[in-house]
Amino acid sequence: NHAAVLIWSCGNESYAGEDILAMSQFFHDHDPGRLVHYEGVFHCRAFDAISDMESRMYAKPWEIREYLESHPKKPFILCEYMHDMGNSLGGMESYVRLADEFDQYQGGFIWDYMDQALRHTDALGRSVLGYGGDFADRNTDYNFSGNGIVYADGAGKPAMQDVRYWYDTPARRAAHDARNAAAAARADRDAAKAQAARKPGTLTVTEGDGNLGVRGDGFEILFSAGEAGPS
């Protein structure tokens, strides 16, 4: 594999100054065909010339809109956004819609693509992906390194479905929505038929725990009740 350099970066989270300006000038002088990026100029406008684009981390959609509506000289790009840690990545639609409305909105880079984890053997002898706190470590960020849209072994997370959907074309998203609506309608009809055909009766759990599950298209909705019944 060979790296494909699209944009030169002057670093990350280092404010701005003469040294970073000199780096930007070096890139412009020796490789004028490529753009130069640096987010830090947002915090220090005296060195605004460092970056060829306006760049922010985790800017809110309305903040980006405010910038784009001000008739700026530079296009806007999010050098980091979404931060897919835990059950996150919600609200991507608000960012994608900006691309449909403003030519100067260049999208962003999800932080990040893949979890950082180490495979180890847990207390039950299973080989698992370990994060902070799984190695008898006391001072830890726990799963802070688990913020990718794929797991450390490359398997896709649920968030990947949302990314795939919103990064698709509007026409393909509409077709996807139509398929989902048709599938939901079929499921409703099937459930109504099953309910109508069901014989009256009672369900009794006499001992132990009770689990009721409904399996769908890649999902499982599970209800669990202990011996004392649902709370």
Regions flagged by a language model, labelled:
Residues 1-188:
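Extended substrate-binding grooves/exosites of carbohydrate-active enzymes
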Residues 64-66, 96, 200-203, 210:
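Generic recognition of flexible, low-complexity loop/linker segments
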Residues 72-73, 104, 208-209, 215-216:
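Short, well-ordered loop/turn elements at secondary-structure boundaries
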Residues 126, 142-144, 152, 197, ...:
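Compositionally biased, low-complexity repeat tracts
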Residues 143, 153, 157, 199, ...:
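Low-complexity, intrinsically disordered regions enriched in charged/polar residues
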Residues 175-208, 220-221:
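Mature N-terminal, pre-catalytic/accessory segment of carbohydrate-active enzymes
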Residues 211-231:
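Acidic-aromatic substrate-binding/catalytic surfaces of carbohydrate-active enzymes
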